[in-house]
């Protein structure tokens, strides 16, 4: 297996008049830091978008719902392996771990726990024993993200807080109604930081093609998986994958190198009010340029970026980095997408 280069990911997206990540133990209100007021989106939420997009692209995934229902790990592994129902079927596979990782695309990225539930049936127990002897207790995913905190303090839109839905009887009469908890933020812009660990990639068979797939997967997942009523209003704005030369080096914490520019509006309501200052990011990339192999970049022209005294559109960021001497790959999200 080819040794991968280590990569850092910086993925910025925004959320307008929606609930980007409700807290189920907090009345499903949008997550916020109680001290700073910053909005929060968990890495779990982002990974769910990515898994769902992988599945829509035709790739098998392990962690999923089928027909809207959650299932046991035993049911999930039978589903992802396809045609495997008992211990004899597992034996016919030969190398079970290789077959599982080949099929479970999401596990190659994010890892998973593989403890299987006990059963009173002898046949099921034999299957569980065969699984446990063939697979580790867990795979640690080589692709990980930190939860994201918004660059701005977010406000909850109280106008959406209580909404009454009226059901029609079909005879022109309105019958009853019920309240919908509709808790949304006015606007937030969220930078995610992630790491592709070249060492951990070997344990899950993460391939070069898998890593390159991230360059379009993240963008398209935000476009395609945020179409429900409460999630609509999220858009990808900037994606940068810093692919390093061989070795175990990375800068770390690229999200902390971004801040709101001075020309941002005092009260943010849409991307038109935002300027993101990427000066420190650009300076950092220049400082470690001899350690960087390639910068993989795509941006949305509706987001403005400050670099020193210059303001550019995010879709021009790749060109700015190229002119600064970096080897830059301008990502074509649609033409480079990888479908199964």
Curated annotation (Swiss-Prot):
Primary location group: cytoplasm
Transcription as UniProt keyword: no
InterPro entries (UniProt xref): Cas7_Csh2/Csh2 (IPR006482), CRISPR-assoc_prot_Cas7/Csh2 (IPR013419)
Annotated TM spans: none
Knocked-out gene: effects: Loss of the 8 Cas genes in this locus (cas1, cas2, cas3, cas4, cas5, cas6, cas7 and cas8b) leads to loss of CRISPR interference against plasmid targeted by this CRISPR locus, i.e. plasmid is not destroyed by CRISPR.
Species whose genome carries this gene: Haloferax volcanii (strain ATCC 29605 / DSM 3757 / JCM 8879 / NBRC 14742 / NCIMB 2012 / VKM B-1768 / DS2)
Subunit structure and binding partners: Component of the Cascade-like complex (Cascade I-B), composed of Cas5, Cas6, Cas7 and crRNA.
Cell compartments where the protein resides: Cytoplasm
GO biological process, one term: defense response to virus
Cellular component aspect of the GO annotation: cytoplasm
Record's miscellaneous remark: There are 3 CRISPR RNA loci in this organism and a single cas gene locus. A CRISPR-Cas type I-B system.
UniProt name for this protein: CRISPR-associated protein Cas7
Higher taxonomy: Archaea, Methanobacteriati, Methanobacteriota, Stenosarchaea group, Halobacteria
Keywords assigned: Antiviral defense, Cytoplasm, Plasmid
Function according to Swiss-Prot or TrEMBL: CRISPR (clustered regularly interspaced short palindromic repeat) is an adaptive immune system that provides protection against mobile genetic elements (viruses, transposable elements and conjugative plasmids). CRISPR clusters contain sequences complementary to antecedent mobile elements and target invading nucleic acids. CRISPR clusters are transcribed and processed into CRISPR RNA (crRNA). Plasmid targeted by CRISPR locus P1 transform wild-type cells very poorly.
